[in-house]
Curated annotation (Swiss-Prot):
It holds the Pfam family Ribosomal_S16. GO terms for biological process: translation. It comes from Chlorobium phaeobacteroides (strain BS1). GO terms for cellular component: cytoplasm; small ribosomal subunit. The gene is rpsP. This is Small ribosomal subunit protein bS16.
Amino acid sequence: MVKIRLRRAGRKKLPVYQIVAADARAPRDGKFLEVIGHYQPTAKPHAITLDKERVAYWLGVGAQPTTTAHSLIRATGLLHEMNMKRKGRSEEEIAAEMEQWQARQNERREKRLAIKTRRRQAKKAAEAEGQESA
C-alpha cells in the first residue's frame, strides 16, 4: 500500500519535511517513491508547497495520506478542488469557487491572528498591573 506522508529533513531543532509517496512498510526517513511537496513548520506562517498534479495522481491511484499529510493537503485546497472536478463542475466554476475559498481562508487566518494578539495584549496588561500593585 502506498502512503502519502512526511519525511523529516533539515537539521537538529529546525525540521523541514518532504511530503512523499512511499510504501507503507518503509521507514519514515527511508526509501520513497516520489517527493510531491515540502512543509516548513518553523516558518511564520507555515510554508506548504505541493505539486498538485502529482498529489492528485497519487490520490487517484489509491495512495492513502496520513492524518498530518491529509490536513496539509486539505489546507492548500486541493481536496476541495478535486471534489468539484469529480462532481463535473466546469473550470470557470472551479476557479471562482477556489477564489472564494481562498478569501474565506484568509479571513479565518486574520481573525485567528487578531484573537491571538488581543490575548497577548491582555496578558501583558494583566502582568503589568500585577507588578504595579506588588
